[in-house]
């Protein structure tokens, strides 16, 4: 048994949960996995974990709810396919009950990676032949993976026709190119470390898309600087170059990924970060317009709520002392499903505001409010390079507010305002 198993206590006699690719991931390089309908998980990065543990109360409504930590290892099923399986950590009794997540349990009996030798001896081939064949297969898989990633870089904008039967999530299960890329890369990394380690900590976070039938997701890389204080000279230079060659340097924000439903053609459009880096300021504005356009008309009813939330977030961040959200993203999410039009008069709008306040008071910052045509979510994600004076081990302590991030928010507010005014809103 490897040292990794001894150093991480896992609850005994607990069924593991099969982790699946999160099909609505449109950006980032960290693998995000589906734990259950309302919960996602991603590899634990100490700095990000510390951020969620010490999160200021007024920022909670602008971030996913943090739900705890699980242990993840990869195992083989009876067909020798590698799967990622989550187990509860000993003594961790967070808001997520693993035993009840039957919808995500493996459909086939799983063989533990540590029992692989026993599995090999049951085959007709000798161990040497099996190892030789296994290495050959792995080499071919690795080469195929590299080819697919190169194709993904070149195919910066993709379209996928959505069937009327079945949910969008089930249809995207084996399609979303960015989600599959991140999932395969995570498996590859864990396989390469198998001899030394097969147990990892992952954090559990709220699935922000679970309330939407056809989630439209915009991932924006925020700020004029992306590298953390601990980045190597090479990494810092690379991140500085990316900022200088994109809209990050000019307006403090760039497109990192997009998934939007176009009702006119019944297609989902995907845009990846490679395309986002190439956009000019005008191109960024056009991409934002495209995100709020369903192929038939501009979803003008979304613009007001988005502006309200962006303005509120900006005010919150202006009060945060010494925080720097380097390489953090901002998600904008709405439902691409067409709903019957509802015209709100001033009294109805006041009633809506009142219902939101009462929902917050009764159920806390993460209350799920009734959805409608204008329901839209704005959340900050990805805090692996965030720093603050609360993090005692940081060599650099910043003063004041994160001006680069706030500059990006103001640019976003200005551009959405322009789109709204030009469309006659």
Swiss-Prot record:
One of its GO terms (biological process) is phosphate ion transport. Substrate binds at residues 215-223, 235-242, 385. Its EC number is 2.7.4.-. Signal peptide: none annotated. InterPro entries: IPK (IPR005522), IPK_sf (IPR038286). Highly expressed in small intestine. It holds the Pfam family IPK. ATP binds at residues 206-208, 219, 382. GO terms for cellular component: cytoplasm; nucleus. Pathway: Phospholipid metabolism; phosphatidylinositol metabolism. Coiled coil: none annotated. Its main location: nucleus. Converts inositol hexakisphosphate (InsP6) to diphosphoinositol pentakisphosphate (InsP7/PP-InsP5). Belongs to the inositol phosphokinase (IPK) family. This is Inositol hexakisphosphate kinase 2. The lineage of its organism: Eukaryota, Metazoa, Chordata, Craniata, Vertebrata. The gene is Ip6k2.
């Amino acid at each position: 048994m490897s040292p990794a198993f001894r150093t991480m206590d896992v609850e005994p006699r607990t069924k593991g949960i099969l982790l699946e690719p999160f099909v609505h991931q449109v950006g980032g390089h960290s693998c995000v996995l589906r734990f259950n309908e309302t919960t996602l998980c991603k590899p634990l990065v100490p700095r990000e974990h510390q951020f969620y543990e010490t999160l200021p109360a007024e920022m909670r409504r602008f971030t996913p709810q943090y739900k705890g930590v699980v242990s993840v290892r990869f195992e083989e099923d009876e067909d020798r396919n590698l799967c990622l399986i989550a187990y509860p950590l000993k003594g961790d009794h967070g808001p997520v009950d693993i035993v009840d997540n039957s919808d995500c349990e493996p459909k086939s009996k799983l063989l533990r990676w540590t029992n692989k030798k026993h599995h090999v001896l049951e085959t007709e081939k000798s161990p040497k032949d099996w190892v030789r064949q296994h290495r050959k297969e792995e080499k071919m898989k690795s080469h195929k993976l590299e080819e697919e990633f190169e194709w993904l870089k070149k195919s910066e904008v993709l379209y996928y026709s959505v069937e009327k039967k079945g949910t969008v999530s089930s249809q995207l299960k084996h399609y979303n190119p960015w989600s599959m890329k991140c999932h395969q890369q995570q498996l590859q990394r864990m396989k390469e470390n198998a001899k030394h380690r097969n147990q990892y900590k992952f954090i559990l976070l709220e699935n922000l898309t679970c309330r939407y039938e056809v989630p439209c997701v915009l991932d924006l890389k925020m700020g004029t600087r992306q590298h953390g204080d601990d980045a190597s000279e090479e990494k810092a230079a690379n991140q500085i170059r990316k900022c200088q060659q994109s809209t990050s340097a000019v307006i403090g924000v760039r497109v990192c990924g997009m998934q939007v439903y176009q009702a006119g053609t019944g297609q989902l459009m995907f845009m990846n970060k490679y395309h986002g880096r190439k956009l000019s300021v005008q191109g960024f504005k056009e991409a934002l317009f495209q995100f709020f356009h369903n192929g038939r008309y501009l979803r003008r009813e979304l613009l007001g709520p988005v502006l309200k939330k962006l303005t509120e977030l900006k005010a919150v961040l202006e009060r945060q002392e010494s925080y720097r959200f380097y390489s953090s993203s901002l998600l904008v999410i709405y439902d691409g499903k067409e709903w019957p039009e509802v015209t709100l008069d001033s009294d109805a709008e006041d009633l809506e505001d009142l219902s939101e306040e009462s929902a917050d008071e009764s159920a806390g910052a993460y209350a799920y409010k009734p959805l409608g045509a204008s329901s839209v979510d704005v959340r900050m994600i990805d805090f692996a390079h965030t720093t603050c004076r609360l993090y005692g081990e940081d060599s650099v302590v910043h003063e004041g507010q994160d001006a680069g991030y706030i500059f990006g928010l103001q640019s976003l507010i200005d551009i959405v305002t322009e789109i709204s005014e030009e469309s006659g809103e």
